[in-house]
């Protein structure tokens, strides 16, 4: 990677499960109950502190609990120390929503405020260890709502990652309409936005608070492609999305996708790669070029 001038991104989800004492490399259920000394670190939901549907990766923490914050920050710093080749370390929370802590302490603030406070603590510890690892923070589910009070104390440490997992792929981002407001946050009763204007509203809310490096982590080939049998429509959406990154105030694009998205063809990734390299690339020309190479005389069929 280094010889080729590439930057290494690592981790993502899984930290919360590790804090709770589980080796967390998947979303699988774990039948082992929480250890008594870990129970206070788990999110309290409906009066109970336990694994969310049995999955450590999907279980949130109680960030009012100092031990949870301390353990989380220590894990991140130890990982950074042990993996100096990592350029961008992704620090995400649980991979589920409507399952954040309901304890009295957590109710006094918001998940995003607690998240930013955690990120600041991680930054202080990385700085103390003289580690330059960049931290990628996540706009996703509850964390789409911007913080109310907290702000990142050392913005140069951080990279914003916008992850609109619930967006529609029927169309690309649209800037023609008027801006819409961010809906009120209701703890454990949020509805994820499918509307593109609403997704952009969340991004703009964070961009008012953070002006550093940023990119989108998007999902066109996660499952939306299943409804597009020839992959032509989704390839056009990908092209349009990439061409609008700068208008969205974003600096790059990561595709959260299945690896085997080549049936009946690999057109979407072909268009994605070329358009990221050259935003002026004509999607129709790329489609024609790909189909001619793949299907020869039958390209027009």
Task: Locate each region found by the language model.
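Extended ligand-binding regions for polar small-molecule ligands
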Residues: 296
